Amino acid sequence: MLLSLAQWLQSISPEFGSFRVFQYLTFRAVMAALTALLIGLLAGPFVIRRLISLKIGQPIREYAMQTHLSKSGTPTMGGVLILMSIGISTLLWFDLSNRFVWIVLLVTLGFGAIGWADDWRKVVLKDPEGMRSREKYLWQSLIGLVAALYLVFSISESSNLRVLELFFSWVQSGFDVDLPPKAGLLVPFVKEISYPLGVFGFVILTYLVIVGSSNAVNLTDGLDGLAIMPVVMVGSALGVFAYVTGSAVYSKYLFFPHIPGSGELLIFCSAMAGAGLAFLWFNTHPAQVFMGDVGALALGAALGTIAVIVRQEIVLAIMGGIFVVEALSVMMQVIWFKYTKKRYGEGRRLFKMAPLHHHFEKSGWKETQVVVRFWIITMLLCLVGLSTLKLR
């Protein structure tokens, strides 16, 4: 929005030449981060008071960790603050004509709406189960598939009109259209190698990345500050990849696919980092507010969508290793419990408690130890992911 305003002012008078600074992506990225940070810090106390007045407190289940029972009643659905900060900041600083930022915003808000409905049922309607799993996955799948169908053609085209033309030609050809190499699965640490996916392969992979990332972040969000800081780190690293793939010069030099327009995602990533740090101010132990599903599902979906656009799905799994391991721990626990119950008549557990962060708590780690150590691991994994920029 401000970019369009600056361009208009420059067109009517040379006196506004100083507004050329708005054309620099890095300047707008820094301002987006600061704007989101300030919005979050200033609006945070009001949002928390409002949540308390509405009695939107986090219910703690009886089988949860005993040390967590004191958290019962802590305001939840604080993800609204994160989404508000990201949304306002991004709309102010990004190029309004950029389709990639719009699709990320829409996916983020869509998954946020699913999380909001889930939280609302749990907290306000007093339904401990919230949205049923099938209903939640149905809506997640719908949004994920729509986003995947759009992205499969938009990666290789520069306008929405061309995206529609390519889609209809794909349908008319009997669903047989070859995608360019840059739409393939990029293999990290290997120069100029991408695995061709085809339209259906791209759609399936995109769906799995978006929905999987969303639920993985949601499962990780179980301790004060545990999920938000890794989101900030991974989102910031993805912003670097967005900047590289959006630049014809840097992408060629580093042997990355050039995706025109993807650099503008740096604005969204910066806003997400600023909003995340602002939320951490209130979410650090002992937390004054929890993000709830409205925040966790939305942020995870945003990370997944950005990774797909910049063709870094594998690198996302590396940098977001904590999210991956947390999700796998739940899946392994459930599968092993059902298997042993069927075979031995008694369900057995691989972990003392899932997700994995609770296993470490039951092993004697303090909550803050688990959180900070997971942060350190994420920071190291992000450095490994960023090293793929050059180690090819």
Curated annotation (Swiss-Prot):
Cofactor entry: Mg(2+)
Membrane topology according to the record: Multi-pass membrane protein
Pathway of action: Cell wall biogenesis; peptidoglycan biosynthesis
Enzyme class: transferase
Catalytic reactions of this protein: UDP-N-acetyl-alpha-D-muramoyl-L-alanyl-gamma-D-glutamyl-meso-2,6-diaminopimeloyl-D-alanyl-D-alanine + di-trans,octa-cis-undecaprenyl phosphate = di-trans,octa-cis-undecaprenyl diphospho-N-acetyl-alpha-D-muramoyl-L-alanyl-D-glutamyl-meso-2,6-diaminopimeloyl-D-alanyl-D-alanine + UMP
Signal peptide from the UniProt entry: none
Domain of life: Bacteria
Membrane-spanning segments: 29-49, 76-96, 100-120, 137-157, 193-213, 225-245, 262-282, 289-309, 314-334, 369-389
EC number per UniProt: 2.7.8.13
Annotated keywords: Cell cycle, Cell division, Cell inner membrane, Cell membrane, Cell shape, Cell wall biogenesis/degradation, Magnesium, Membrane, Metal-binding, Peptidoglycan synthesis, Transferase, Transmembrane, Transmembrane helix
A GO molecular-function descriptor: metal ion binding
Cited function: Catalyzes the initial step of the lipid cycle reactions in the biosynthesis of the cell wall peptidoglycan: transfers peptidoglycan precursor phospho-MurNAc-pentapeptide from UDP-MurNAc-pentapeptide onto the lipid carrier undecaprenyl phosphate, yielding undecaprenyl-pyrophosphoryl-MurNAc-pentapeptide, known as lipid I.
Family listed: Belongs to the glycosyltransferase 4 family. MraY subfamily.
Protein name as annotated: Phospho-N-acetylmuramoyl-pentapeptide-transferase
Lineage summary: Bacteria, Pseudomonadati, Pseudomonadota, Betaproteobacteria, Burkholderiales
